[in-house]
């Protein structure tokens, strides 16, 4: 059986959940959207893969990710049934951008392949992001991996090796869209508009989305700069006190002094 599943918490905007469901339904596909608030994504994926039947193929999808056509889903399932791992390429953001892997934002894998690899956990560790160790084990075992690479992005944030950049509102070759960082409410309009265009069968106005996102990106930049400045100023005050031989007062003492002054 071909299965499609996504996980979400109760803090995800229900419009995002509904948009994903509607896109899959538009292509004649049912997606099992499971609310498991508080459960780590990797733990959910581990338990889900153990749950599916031996002959099943799973398409693991982030709640803010969906296909832009039916063909890419059929291609993903066909690859997984043939024993391959298929999905969107990602890197560990700014930590290790040269080390690419198929991420479970859009990953097709069969239960047989997962069993063959020894049922590796999807959970991250000090050296790996979610599913990164699974990807490396597959490569070492000779399992063929097919990766889709970004072709456009509304708000670039990270480098993907020497191939491309990705970030908020990324479009992948073949027809996959992933919002990324869906917790950032200001950018939800990107996903909602891409979903509506996909369902309506009209071209996606990527340039228009970029224009609308630009002021948000500039604001994010200056907010980040201000936070860095505040942190630097706080450190400077501590260093000045240490140079004068006056240790910084504990937070509680500062609060008491402030109260007494009032």
Annotated model-derived regions:
Residues 135-262:
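C-terminal catalytic/acceptor-binding lobe
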Residues 66-137:
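Conserved catalytic core of nucleotide-sugar-dependent glycosyltransferases
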Residues 55, 82-85, 143:
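Short, high-confidence coil segments that cap the C-terminus of an alpha-helix
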Residues 55-66:
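Short beta-strand-to-loop acidic/aromatic patch adjacent to the donor-nucleotide binding site
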Residues 33-35, 89, 149:
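Residue-level recognition of beta-strand->loop/alpha-helix junctions
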Residues 10-12, 38-39, 64-67, 91-93, ...:
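Short, solvent-exposed loop/turn segments at secondary-structure junctions
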Residues 1-55:
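N-terminal anchoring/stem segment of glycosyltransferases
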Residues 22-25, 50-51, 74-81, 140:
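Short, surface-exposed basic-aromatic patches at helix termini and helix-loop junctions that form
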């Amino acid at each position: 059986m071909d299965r499609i599943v996504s996980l979400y918490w109760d803090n995800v905007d229900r419009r995002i959940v509904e948009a994903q469901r509607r896109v899959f339904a538009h292509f004649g596909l049912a997606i099992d959207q499971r609310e498991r608030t508080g459960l780590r994504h990797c733990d959910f994926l581990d338990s889900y893969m153990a749950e599916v039947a031996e002959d099943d193929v799973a398409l693991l999808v982030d709640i803010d990710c969906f296909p832009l056509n039916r063909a890419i889903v059929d291609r993903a399932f066909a690859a997984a049934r043939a024993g391959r791992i298929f999905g969107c390429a990602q890197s560990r953001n700014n930590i290790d951008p040269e080390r690419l892997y198929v991420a479970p934002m859009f990953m097709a894998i069969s239960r047989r392949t997962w069993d063959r690899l020894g049922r590796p956990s999807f959970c991250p560790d000090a050296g790996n992001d979610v599913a990164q160790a699974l990807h490396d084990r597959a490569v070492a075992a000779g399992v063929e991996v097919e990766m889709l690479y970004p072709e456009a992005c509304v708000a670039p944030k990270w480098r993907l090796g020497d191939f491309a950049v990705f970030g908020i509102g990324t479009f992948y070759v073949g027809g996959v869209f992933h919002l990324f960082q869906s917790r950032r409410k200001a950018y939800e309009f990107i996903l909602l508009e891409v979903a509506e265009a996909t369902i309506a069968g009209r071209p996606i106005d990527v340039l228009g989305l970029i224009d609308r996102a630009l002021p948000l990106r500039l604001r994010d930049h200056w907010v980040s700069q201000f936070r860095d400045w505040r942190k630097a100023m706080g450190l400077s005050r501590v260093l000045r006190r240490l140079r004068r031989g006056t240790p910084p007062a504990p937070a509680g003492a500062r609060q008491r002094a402030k109260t007494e002054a009032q």
